[in-house]
Every structure is written in C-alpha cells, then in structure tokens.
C-alpha cells in the first residue's frame, strides 16, 4: 500500500509513475497489487481491506493433485527447466500441495539442487496465474524424486 496519497498532488506525483517505481524497487513481490491509500481521509482503505481479505481467503485454497499435475505438464511444456550447471537434464515428477497459508507446493525433481532460482519464480508465477492466487504468497519446495527400486 502506498500511504499518504493525499499528499501526492502537492508533490507532483502520479499513480502511473509511482506504480513503475514500486514495481522496479520491489521486483520480488510483483504479484502483489499496488493500492493507494490515505489513512487521513480514508481513501482506498476499503479496497485495501478487501484485498487483504481476498488474499487471505485465496491462501487457504487447496488444489487437487490431478489439477496440479496437468498444470505442471503445461508449465514444463511452455518453459522447460534448465540446470544451473547447464548440462544436467532435469526431470520433474510428482507435484502436490503440502499445506495452506501460505499455499506450499512440492515438486519432485531428480536434482533439486540444480534447479535455477529463476525457475522457482516461474513456477510460483505460473501457479498464481493458473489458479488465481494473485496477491498471495506461494512457497515452492523442490524435493528429490524417490529412486525406483530403493527401499525406504
């Protein structure tokens, strides 16, 4: 939230430029909406509260594994994972939701330590878009796929 927006006209500020500045400085939360409020006169406070309530509710959503599996196939076909080492072939297996608040998604992959950090962001943003989780923090966990034939 950009507070004290009632002072903006006197400072020569406009929403478009302010949104650009906020998005540039806070790249790590581009999924979060930018809301303009003035606590002094109450402008934008209702929208802020509604957005917070909506984000909280979306954070409690549970997505069935079958839907996640289909979405994951689509994500990978659209943008194949690359290894941070460049030559290792990464293969993703099972995907499931482990918890809510924040929604935590587990992706099984053959070499999780080699998945580039930008692919974490890609998966989180793809999940947000696919399942309407905007304004909701998402946790991505990459786990090693269990090896076939090994006893636990």
Language-model regions, residue ranges each:
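C-terminal-of-GTPase-core extension/linker across diverse P-loop GTPases
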Residues: 1-152
């Amino acid at each position: 939230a950009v507070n004290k927006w009632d002072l903006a006209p006197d400072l020569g500020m406009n929403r478009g430029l302010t949104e650009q500045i906020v998005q540039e400085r806070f790249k790590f939360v581009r999924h979060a909406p930018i809301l303009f409020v003035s606590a002094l006169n109450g402008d934008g406070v209702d929208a802020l509260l509604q957005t917070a309530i909506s984000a909280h509710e979306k954070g409690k959503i549970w997505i069935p594994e079958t839907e996640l599996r289909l979405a994951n196939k689509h994500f990978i076909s659209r943008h194949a994972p690359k290894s941070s080492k460049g030559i290792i072939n990464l293969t993703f297996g099972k995907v499931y939701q482990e918890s809510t608040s924040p929604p935590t998604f587990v992706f099984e992959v053959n070499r999780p330590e080699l998945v580039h950090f930008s692919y974490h962001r890609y998966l989180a943003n793809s999940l947000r878009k696919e399942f309407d989780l905007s304004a909701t923090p998402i946790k991505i966990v990459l786990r090693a796929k269990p090896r076939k034939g090994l006893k636990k």
